[in-house]
């Protein structure tokens, strides 16, 4: 059963995780968010009921 031989795919998996953790992740974490969270209280809108013309 060739899938039990970890020789070809284990190295590829380790290298792909190393690239993700060392190169891609710091670049993604350095981005700033455009909308920072605020402490405003959440207000629920009070919608007016729709008047249907055919009722």
From Swiss-Prot:
Keywords: ATP synthesis, CF(0), Hydrogen ion transport, Ion transport, Membrane, Mitochondrion, Transmembrane, Transmembrane helix, Transport. The chain crosses the membrane at residues 9-29. GO terms for biological process: proton motive force-driven ATP synthesis. Pfam families: ATP-synt_8 (PF00895). GO terms for molecular function: proton transmembrane transporter activity. GO terms for cellular component: mitochondrial membrane; proton-transporting ATP synthase complex. Subunit 8, of the mitochondrial membrane ATP synthase complex (F(1)F(0) ATP synthase or Complex V) that produces ATP from ADP in the presence of a proton gradient across the membrane which is generated by electron transport complexes of the respiratory chain. ATP synthase complex consist of a soluble F(1) head domain - the catalytic core - and a membrane F(1) domain - the membrane proton channel. These two domains are linked by a central stalk rotating inside the F(1) region and a stationary peripheral stalk. This is ATP synthase F(0) complex subunit 8. It comes from Rhea americana (Greater rhea).
């Amino acid at each position: 059963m060739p899938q039990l031989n970890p020789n070809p795919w284990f190295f590829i998996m380790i290298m792909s995780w190393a690239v993700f953790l060392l190169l891609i992740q710091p670049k993604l974490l350095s981005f700033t968010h455009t909308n920072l969270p605020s402490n405003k209280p959440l207000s629920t809108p009070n919608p007016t009921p729709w008047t249907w013309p055919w009722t």
